Amino acid sequence: MSNSAKLIDVITKVALPIGIIASGIQYSMYDVKGGSRGVIFDRINGVKQQVVGEGTHFLVPWLQKAIIYDVRTKPKSIATNTGTKDLQMVSLTLRVLHRPEVLQLPAIYQNLGLDYDERVLPSIGNEVLKSIVAQFDAAELITQREIISQKIRKELSTRANEFGIKLEDVSITHMTFGPEFTKAVEQKQIAQQDAERAKFLVEKAEQERQASVIRAEGEAESAEFISKALAKVGDGLLLIRRLEASKDIAQTLANSSNVVYLPSQHSGGGNSESSGSPNSLLLNIGR
């Protein structure tokens, strides 16, 4: 046998075992990255109940397989259309922050698989939403939104725990009502505005009525005062009022450019009350 043939034979005998060993080592090692956990499936014994932490680990190639789960908190949106207590349709969207319970990962893999969240959350989310929304009227969904969110969070967390899922937060991110309810709300707002306007008009009329009463009372008191004054002084008060009125009229006529003042001319045998004195003229005007 030649030297080259011997060399090839030696390399084959050495390299083959080394290759098999290297391949076995490669397939027997696996890494669990940060924020992840591993579950081991054994072809003989099934899913092991021990959860594998972060780092590099070994398994038996072909007989065992590592299933890696992301255990960090992830968001999930759940949308549904449902009816309220007063038979109004409403569209709701929930944002759910969830993660798997680490110790429940073997059971989650056995019962649900890797897509556990897609299998569970939409189903129980719709169930809880329909159940709770049906307990409230459409208007209460708006006025008691925080209370409803708390009830949804509590009920949904309880249901999710049954499947090994931990909910970090649940909140309503979107809420829309049907056109009938929207129209009813608009009509209610218009009715409230009309009621406020009518109330304002009633209050204004009442204020005007009270003002009229006060004004009438004042006029009555003034008339009573004048009557008492007349009873005490007789016609003297009327004469003073006539003089004041005559003075105002004379002043107005004097200031007018279109009026010419002509003194009165009377015969000597005329009535003394009709004499041409200015005072007599003013008194006659006042009368």
UniProtKB/Swiss-Prot annotation:
Residues 272-287 have a biased composition (Low complexity). It is a peripheral membrane protein. Gene3D superfamilies: Band 7 domain. One of its GO terms (biological process) is mitochondrion organization. Disruption phenotype: Impairs mitophagy; decreases interaction between ATG11 and ATG32. Keywords: Coiled coil, Membrane, Mitochondrion, Mitochondrion inner membrane. InterPro entries: Band_7 (IPR001107), Band_7/SPFH_dom_sf (IPR036013), Prohibitin (IPR000163). This is Prohibitin-1. It comes from the Eukaryota. Present with 9690 molecules/cell in log phase SD medium. PHB1 subunits are targeted to mitochondria by an unconventional non-cleavable targeting sequence present at their N-terminus. The N-terminus is blocked. One of its GO terms (cellular component) is mitochondrion. Belongs to the prohibitin family. Prohibitin probably acts as a holdase/unfoldase for the stabilization of newly synthesized mitochondrial proteins. Involved in mitophagy; may act as an adapter for ATG8 that supports mitophagosome assembly. Negatively regulates the proteolytic processing of ATG32 via the i-AAA protease. Acts as a negative regulator of the m-AAA protease. Residues 180-224 form a coiled coil. The mitochondrial prohibitin complex consists of two subunits (PHB1 and PHB2). The subunits assemble into a membrane-associated ring-shaped supercomplex of approximately 1 mDa. The mitochondrial prohibitin complex interacts with the m-AAA protease, a heterohexamer composed of YTA12/RCA1 and YTA10/AFG3. The mitochondrial prohibitin complex interacts with ATG8 and the interaction may support mitophagosome assembly. The keyword Mitochondrion applies. It is found in: Mitochondrion inner membrane. Residues 102-116 are annotated as: Interaction with ATG8. PANTHER family: PROHIBITIN, PROHIBITIN 1. A motif (AIM) lies at residues 109-112.
